[in-house]
Amino acid sequence: MRVWAISNQKGGVGKTTTTVALGSLLAASGKRTLLIDMDPHASLSGYIGVEGGAHGSVYDLFGIGGNPLPPGTLVHATKWDHLSVLPASAAMITLDRQLGTRPGMGLILSQALAELAVDFDHVLLDCPP
C-alpha cells in the first residue's frame, strides 16, 4: 500500500482538490483507493458526500472519551467504484489539546494504516494547513 500525504502550510492552495483528483484517477484505473480527511473543516468529506458525525470519523481512531474504534469500521464506501473515504470531524480541531502527552499518540495513524493495508492499494491523506 502506498500512502500519499497532500499537505501545505497554507490553506486554500488546492490540497483537497488535488487529493480528490489523484484519488479519482487511481480509483478509475482500478486501484483500491482510500481518501482520509485529516482536516477539521471536512471539505473532502463534504465534497465526496460522506459526513463523519454518527457514522464515525478519523477522530474516533484516537479514543477520546472511550475506546478507539477499529479503522475498518470508520471507512465509508462512495458512489464511485474502488473509492472509499474515512471522513473528518470538526471535533478534530481539539485533538492536539485532548491527546496532550499521551504515550504512543504519534503511532495511532500509522497503526490504523497498517490495519487497512490489506484493503487498499493507495491511501491519500488530505492534511490540514
Each model region followed by its residue ranges:
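P-loop NTP-binding core
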Residues: 1-129
